Amino acid sequence: MVEVVTYANKSFGMFEDLINNDFGVKVKVLGWGTKWHGFSDKSKGLLKYLQNKRDKDIIVFVDGFDTKINKSIENVAKMFKQCECKVLLSRDPQVMGKHITNHIFGTCTSAHVGNAGMFMGYAKELKLMMKDAISMGCKDDQINLNRLCGKYDFIKVDENDLIFKNFGPRDKETSTNAVFVSFPGNMNIKRWSRAIPEYAQFFYLHILLVNILLLAALPKRTKPLLLSLALITVYYIIFADRSCTIKT
């Protein structure tokens, strides 16, 4: 049995196309009408949904706003079993570049970052992972999933994009034979304002070090600005979210 599940509290982006897809695939919507508190909402919603599922039920989770069902899902279970794993993550497109993406999220395998926007697995193992993800201090679900790859040997990444394909904003070619396809969302001011404080926690020491070096090297007339930047960085270190960089 294969079920497709998403988490969406409203209709936005590609949501209507996902629900009213061309292949008659029923998509279970979690979280509808609720207030969004953060990425952990998805893990909590999925865990609650999984409680009534049989261990061997196969659940496909997709992003509600960016995902398209590209073809029939009739062979998905067979394709998944051929991967010889219990949980399969989609491959991240590394929009921010390989080094920055790896620095923030870590890698699931030696070469690939798993993407939390699309993944699938058996209900038993997904329940185990969602419980762990919720208990982790980090507020970012993708970071948590990649860290869990180091804990469990039953997780793999769809390295060849056979079931899942994530396109990046710079991809000119968007044709694929994958079953589930994710297209980049609009990088508007709201998304940037959310992303900067979430991911700046991985770079604040780098920024502070650069400010200190520039304060020592550049002319006096530029130092007030650099000093201000350094003070802002220190303020961030003290008060801002560092849930993913401090071990609990």
What are these regions (language model features)?
Residues 1-58, 210-247:
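N-terminal anchoring/stem segment of glycosyltransferases
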Residues 27-36, 89-93, 157-163:
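A generic structural motif
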